[in-house]
Amino acid sequence: MASAVVSMVPTTASRFALLQVDSSSDSDSEKARGAHATGKARSGSAAKGKSKGNEKKKEKRRKKKEQQQSEANELRNLAFKKIPSKPSQGIGGALQEHSTHNVPKEYQEDDWQQWQQRDEQLTSDMFEADLEKALMLSKLEYEESKDNGNEVNGVPQSKKVNKKDKRRNNQGKDKPLTVPLKDFQLEDQQAKKQEELKSPAMPQDRGFFNKLEEDVTKIILKEKRKEHSSDVTESFSTPDYSMEPALKDGKTEVLKQEIEKKEAELKQMKSIISQWEAKYREVKARNSQLLKMLQEGEMKDKAEILLQVDELLSIKNELTLQVTTLHAALEQERSKVKVLQAEQVKYQGGKKSKKNPESEHGR
């Protein structure tokens, strides 16, 4: 299972691929032997140059060993969550820069390719190991949760890991030996696993298991209640069930009496409801009749009013005609009066003219 998952996941170079560190002193000895063999092939005139070159190589080896030890200590401190001291960091950086300047480019490229291959192999191997460990831990936790409830596995493993870490720390303090990258990666991953185990994720798992247990108990109780209710209904539905022992009790008799009283009350209520329904129907019929009468009365009143309006309009028309005739007669009379008045004035003027000459003649 783990190998299949690893084949699906692409492996990449780890963060340790950037470190230019040799695997052990054996590679250095092999390089020195090769350099020494090539030095022997040279002429005898360059013997002094060879001795100087050997001294330089020895110094380089010593510097490389010191660099490896400093980097190993730094990686140990990082794995066990320790802050490295500032002077050691400065010395390691200076040594690394000096070594990178002194090492030729061909060796650096070869070392770089070798380290890349090793890192890829290490990452794939470590990924497989982590998957296997995770699967085993999950299985163990599941089995222990079934058996013991909420116990968690992982405490003895952490103790073993701590013992191994202490031994490795003591070895690093006592012996100035180089440590391979596998051990550092293992220690780092084990420390991370310890932190994950110590993290407050387990109470949540416990709460989850407790909830599961509560849900299971609730479901079981519901099923039991359903079974009990089904058994009771079946016992009541069977003809073998007799009410004789229940009738003997006083409670059943009291209940029967109460039921009879309630039935009588229900009958009375039903009769009252039927009476009220009949009354409601009568009132409804009366209301319908009243509505019809009111509608008819309103129509009659409207018809009478319209007739009266017609009569009044006819009277109005007659009166207007009379007024017009009277007005014409009045104007005629006025014209006659005016004519008579004019004639009267003339008549009076003629009489006066006749009287005046007669008076003058008498004088």
Curated annotation (Swiss-Prot):
The entry's localization annotation reads: Golgi apparatus
Main subcellular localisation: Golgi
Q: Which UniProt keywords apply?
A: Coiled coil, Golgi apparatus
- Quote the biased-composition stretches of kind Basic and acidic residues, using this chain's numbering: 98-107
Against PANTHER family, the record matches this protein to:
G KINASE ANCHORING PROTEIN 1, G KINASE-ANCHORING PROTEIN 1
Role this protein plays: May play a role in the regulation of insulin-dependent IRS1 tyrosine phosphorylation in adipocytes.
| Record-given protein name | G kinase-anchoring protein 1
